[in-house]
Design a protein with these regions (language model features):
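Short Lys/Arg-rich cationic patches that frequently serve as NLS/NoLS or arginine-rich RNA/DNA-binding motifs
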Residues: 1-9
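A structural signal for multi-pass alpha-helical bundles of membrane permease subunits
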Residues: 8-318
Length: 318
């Protein structure tokens, strides 16, 4: 009996060896640097003296940090619901197209099967294309569209000679407008973020939709359930595990919007799009490592609390 237990333990032990490289990688590139950031947040950068929570107090009282935190929160609250809802709708439509293709295949309707599969492939290419575009190319696109001499201003001036809406636009737009330096900049940022990461969320939703057994839908159809009831009582409940992952990854991806804004507007953009990453970048340039460390710890704490609360609410509803 002891020999058998010893053999079982021997078989189980190799699993830890496979996990060891991952654990070392996370420790070296994640846990240890973060621990150093936490340590630096309690010390002054210049002389290395211990200052307690003084850095945290300075960060909270900083007007730039306050503005950036409000803008970032506003950006996340605006973007995430739009992104989740739009990506879910498009993923469900795409899934329906693939289901129709499978039905046509069963009925040996080759022409319609190829049509539906071609449509699905075209849709996939459309929503995955923005993910493949580099940030620098997105910046060029922004400048072409929203610069004072860009496409939007040219289109409005072209319409100004027409009746109706053209006259209204000509009154509102007397001169060329740099849209990235107006209140419209926030809306442009939201639109570009949703456009950029829509395909990422669609892929995640598609993975969840593909995991739902088709037999459930067939049984519901035989029982007389309509499309809406099938959606609310079968599709959405089965997507709950995927929804948790999509929400978390979408929130984390929302912090990547800084690159495009920085390339277009620099370190001090229009107030509506001045995000937390701008504060970190400016503090890094002035070597305010202590403030930057304190702000990073606070941000990590807020994200961790958000994830834990979301996970707990998910578990309660299940």
């Amino acid at each position: 009996m002891r020999m058998k237990r010893h053999k079982i333990r021997k078989k189980r032990n190799p699993g830890w060896y496979f996990l060891l490289p991952e654990f070392l990688g996370v420790s070296v590139f994640g846990l240890i640097p973060f621990a150093d950031v936490v340590r630096r947040s309690f010390f002054q950068t210049v002389d290395g003296s211990f200052v307690g929570i003084s850095n945290y107090v300075q960060v909270i009282k900083n007007d730039a940090f306050d503005l950036a935190a409000k803008n970032t929160l506003r950006f996340v609250v605006t973007c995430i619901p739009c992104l989740l809802l739009l990506s879910l709708i498009l993923a469900m439509l795409l899934q329906q197209v693939l289901i129709l293709a499978e039905k046509k295949k069963k009925h040996r309707d080759v022409t319609m099967e190829q049509f539906y599969r071609g449509s699905a492939a075209a849709l996939k290419s459309m929503y995955l294309l923005p993910m493949a575009i580099p940030a620098a190319s997105v910046v060029v696109l922004w400048k072409i569209l929203f610069d004072s001499h860009g496409f939007v201003n040219s289109a409005i001036h072209a319409l100004s000679g027409m009746n109706g809406i053209g006259k209204i636009l000509s009154v509102l737009l007397v001169r060329e407008v740099d849209w990235m330096n107006t209140d419209a900049a926030f809306g442009i940022l939201v639109f570009s973020y949703v456009w950029k990461y829509l395909g990422y969320d669609i892929v995640l939703w598609m993975a969840g939709l593909s995991a739902i057994p088709q037999g459930i839908y067939e049984a519901a159809e035989m029982d007389g359930a309509g499309k809406w009831k099938t959606c609310f009582y079968i599709t959405l409940p089965n997507l709950r595990p995927v929804a948790f992952t999509v929400v978390i990854l979408s929130v984390l991806n929302s912090f990547k919007a800084f690159r495009e804004v920085y390339m277009v507007a620099g370190s001090y953009p229009q107030e509506n799009i001045y995000l937390l990453q701008h504060v970190f970048s400016n503090w890094f340039q002035t070597l305010s490592v202590d403030k930057m460390a304190a702000a990073s710890v606070m941000l990590a704490f807020v994200i961790a609390v958000f994830v834990l609360l979301l996970e707990r609410s998910w578990e309660r509803e299940e």
